[in-house]
Amino acid sequence: MKNYPWLKIDTASIMFSSLSSPDWGRTFHMSAYFDKEINPDILRKACEDLKPYYPSMFSYLKRGFFWNYMALTDKMPEICSEDEKCLCPIVMKKDRTPDFRLTYSENRVTMDCSHSLGDGMGAGRFAEALITRYNELMNGEDGKYVSTQNPEENTVNAFAEHYKKDGEVAPDVTTKAFHFDEKYENQNLKLIFVELPVDEIKKKAKEKGLSVTEYYVSVLIQGMLKTDKKAADDLIVIGVPVNLRSFFKTKSVRNFTIQSYVSFSPEGRSDYSLDEIFETVRGQLRKQLTAEDVQKTVNKYGSLVNNPVLRIVPNVIKLPVLKKKQRGTHECMSSIFTNVGVCTLPEELARSVRSVELVNGDASRYGLGVTTSAISYNGKLSVCFSHTNNNTVWCENCVEILKSLGFSVNTHTRERKGTVSVGAKEKEAVCADRLKAYFNI
């Protein structure tokens, strides 16, 4: 490369990337099941067509002198069979490939995406565009690809754009929450997908005056109480990421979510009925998500990168502090439930895509052995339990609770295959832009 295009890391990625290493990275996974076997050559062509419109997706994480940053690349992502790499994390590497990977197996295609690139809603837009273009090519469309997407709008750091320098800042959450006694098994990731009809859970949630998220979180809480007796003596907290695109106008595919929390204090009891848990859970999220409180949280994120003292501290000193802060943030959560809502695909694409899945991924470096995620498509709610070991009792208890409530429940599993590996190191350009990136100027 004769030049060195780069982007300042988005505000949330400062924290996400602090724990990234050559053997681990915070990674989520999105899958689509087509009605035909995946063609990897056409998948690559679809990816090439999208590249000019989503520049931030074609970047990789780098350590700078003061801050991490994202180096844009002219290379394509790794595209391989699931037999080689299935659900493996995106790690720090020196081969200049983008921080996402595409894998395929029979009729399933999966995007493994580093959280440094974006969140589930932002990167999900790219994933939807990718499978849309793939489907067009599979159906014989071979003309020049033109998109209405604006690459500049897609790469905006929305946190920085909506940060108010003199605005009030939300306080840090310091409460310690119940955690399972987890044994992390090296490079293990076992997924259990729990599927149930969307209409059924919507109806039952409405009867109780709850959202679908509140209803399912209540099931998760009761499942914890049934799984571990120690949960009754601690505060149970489920972290629920909130998409800020419904509060602020932005088209960015980069990170723009904040954490909200659902708390339940058992006070020594483990025999709570679901109705009792509903009473406590109802309305908690709504109270946290006023426009005023959301702005305070955005200001809190922005105050980190705009702290005049922190800005001049070298990264080698700053990173251990950020790592500790990131782990501390997750000490206040028992687990995470990410619900991206309903996936609505274009009509022609929907005829070819049978189902979709969202996987929160491995959060063991945060101290969370099991995370959960959900997406609705084609009348089904698909909830994934991501385990970093083989202890699946919590998930099994939640399934039994759902069945006892009369839900039609189906389950299936997936497991990580292959190992983390990266390509050979490639030289980067030596130029003024690279120095600017390294020193974040």
Residue ranges and their predicted role:
Residues 1-11, 105-108, 117-125, 129-203, ...:
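Non-catalytic, low-complexity flexible loops and terminal extensions
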Residues 1-66, 74-101, 226-441:
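Acyl-thioester-dependent acyl-group transfer interface
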Residues 55-64, 138-158, 203-219, 324-340:
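Short, charge-rich amphipathic segments
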Residues 35-52, 112-128, 193-230, 383-385, ...:
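Acyl activation and transfer enzymes in specialized metabolism, enriched
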